[in-house]
Amino acid sequence: MINVVAIMGRLTYDPELRTTPTGVSVVRFQVAVDRNFQRAGEERKADFIDVTAWRQTAEFVSKYFRKGSMIAVEGSIQTDNFTDKDGNKRKSVQVVASNVSFCGSKAESGT
């Protein structure tokens, strides 16, 4: 079976590095990705995709990327089932990043 995803878009907020109780670095961020099509007379729509990165990838993202940065993410899709505080069953979908890279100019990325 294959579970591979690649997205490219802009970060919607600054990533914030966290550390698990066992000392593993993790960062969660969201990427706005424009859809490939646009209906006549309408604005282009975007999808907002949640991404999680671990260890060195998390540290790299938190150090070099900010809100508005263009980013390319390679990884896999992961789903989680959970019950919210009101007792409703929910499902979340996210990309778990295995690789990230710059997509904008040096001036745009701030490096």
Each language-model region and where it sits:
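Single-stranded nucleic acid-binding surfaces, predominantly the OB-fold ssDNA-binding core
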Residues: 1-111
